């Protein structure tokens, strides 16, 4: 597996396990997204990572702020999207290994 993809997966798993909070996750994800020494990420995996990136833009843990904008999502929805991303990345890894 590509080392850059593994870093993204490990970061997502840390967040889901509660090892880091959403603010730490957002900061680390952004830093990793713009890492200069990143390996080339295949298009299918990048689409998944980019989708998580998009969810970071609409994730708002504060209920009062979320009420002002209908497009904002809560932590439960965000975690669900992270779980889907990990599952889809694993699926792609397994498909690649079968060829």
List where the protein language model places each region.
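Acidic, Ser/Pro/Thr-rich low-complexity regulatory regions
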Residues: 1-99
């Amino acid at each position: 597996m590509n080392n850059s993809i593994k870093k993204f997966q490990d970061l997502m798993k840390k967040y889901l396990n509660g090892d880091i909070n959403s603010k730490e996750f957002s900061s680390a994800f952004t830093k990793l997204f713009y890492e200069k020494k990143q390996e080339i990420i295949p298009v299918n995996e990048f689409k998944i990572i980019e989708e998580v990136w998009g969810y970071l833009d609409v994730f708002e843990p504060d209920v009062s702020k979320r009420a002002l904008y209908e497009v904002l999502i809560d932590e439960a929805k965000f975690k669900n999207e992270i779980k889907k991303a990990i599952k889809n990345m694993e699926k792609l890894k397994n498909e690649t290994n079968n060829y």
